């Protein structure tokens, strides 16, 4: 079926969402809707493609470039190494078969979260990630708890504010692209 995705920065689509039985995902400090940036979803690759984890690592490095503004090649290398480790601790490797448990694709509860990565980092990277784990942006440190299989999904980014809107936009664009 046809899927519709709407990014709503001004909460203009709430009434329409109710009329169309759309899912509204509100992202922000007071929200109870969470999207885990570490989720790997089965729909995220075409059938003939392989490499779920490699694809996800590239997307995560892009996301962390937003958080850290700029990273050295050494920082990117450290970050990639630690990302691989947090997935390995969840039993997920570059072998796509590790994403299946009892012949079903692993759920969001089987995926790492930001805190898992934070606990592996040291120094400057760890310090810069702290607000996303324990501070005002800790709503990004949760397992996904929203239904993503609706044909109409509205991403409410009203609460994010000017400084943090880039994180919400990235998360939703990646989610919708998948």
Identify the residue ranges that each predicted region occupies:
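Short beta-strand "acidic-cap" motif of Rossmann-like dinucleotide-binding folds
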Residues: 6
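P-loop NTPase motor domains
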Residues: 9-178
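Glycine-rich phosphate-binding P-loop
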Residues: 1
